[in-house]
């Protein structure tokens, strides 16, 4: 006679330990290709939406007003502040695709103002205010936050330190601010997975920039010329992208139903459109 016990979990309730039926991913019913495509589309929309906030002159101006003489130091200390009192070299390793000497110097400048935790709090509130100001007209912000929080809850934190740090930051209560903050956390999840895949590929950070967005971005991330173009590693870079998208697809397949996967991709694309329409150029 088989002996059965119960296993309790705060999110999924109680299950018999002898239950032989595995719990299938929620995303069943959608082909693997569709799942990966939706995950890739949502990832691109989230990345671009958060980049609008990170790169906007208004954000830099607010960092300057908060005491960061160099607003890039405010960005580095703000985004990396959840790592705690780390060395510049450690933060540069986590940021992965920045020129490390310059990144380390920006970190030291930034944490000298308010410390690491204080910088993270300032940056988090800046993200919230940016969402309130420019995302309020977007449709489905509550759903972006709800679905995003479910994905954040199931995603492992191992080897993705910025995601691990940001996922425990308190979220704003209002939908526009909360939605942008949730997208911010999801951006760190995908970026961390991408960096892990990149590190295994043999593609250097500067080669990755050249294979992705080219010399303008390479310079923006602090790399000096001449730039190694990595032209012989195009196929490898494509596989890095595919690996990242497949892993994100696995996670969304656990967190969401099939219809919700497509829904999130559509809502984040619409949110990005709203930002592009409302944010001053």
Locations of regions flagged by a protein language model:
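Phosphate/adenylate-binding glycine loop and adjacent helical scaffold
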Residues: 18-230, 274-281
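N-terminal amphipathic/basic-hydrophobic helices that include classical n-h-c signal peptides
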Residues: 1-26
């Amino acid at each position: 006679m088989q002996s059965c016990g119960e296993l309790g979990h705060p999110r999924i309730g109680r299950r018999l330990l002898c239950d032989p039926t595995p719990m299938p991913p929620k995303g069943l019913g959608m082909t693997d290709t569709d799942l990966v495509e939706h995950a890739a589309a949502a990832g691109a929309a989230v990345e671009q939406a958060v980049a609008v906030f990170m790169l906007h002159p208004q954000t830099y101006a607010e960092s300057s007003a908060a005491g960061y003489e160099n607003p890039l130091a405010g960005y580095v200390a703000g985004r990396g502040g959840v790592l705690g009192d780390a060395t510049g070299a450690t933060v540069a390793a986590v940021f992965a695709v920045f020129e490390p000497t310059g990144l380390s110097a920006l970190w030291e400048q930034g944490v000298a103002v308010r410390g690491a935790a204080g910088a993270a709090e300032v940056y988090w509130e800046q993200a919230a205010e940016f969402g309130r100001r420019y995302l309020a007209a977007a449709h489905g912000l509550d759903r972006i936050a709800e679905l995003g929080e479910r994905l954040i809850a199931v995603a492992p934190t191992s080897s993705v330190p910025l995601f691990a740090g940001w996922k425990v930051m308190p979220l704003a209560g209002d939908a526009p601010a909360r939605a942008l903050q949730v997208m911010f956390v999801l951006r760190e999840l995908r970026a961390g997975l991408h960096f892990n895949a990149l590190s295994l590929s043999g593609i250097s950070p500067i080669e990755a920039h050249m294979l992705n967005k080219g010399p303008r971005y390479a310079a923006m991330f602090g790399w000096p010329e001449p730039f190694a173009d990595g032209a012989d590693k195009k196929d490898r870079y494509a596989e890095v992208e595919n690996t990242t998208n497949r892993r994100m697809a696995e996670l969304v397949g656990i967190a969401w139903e099939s219809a919700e996967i497509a829904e999130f991709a559509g809502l984040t694309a619409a949110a990005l459109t709203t930002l592009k329409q409302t944010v001053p150029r």
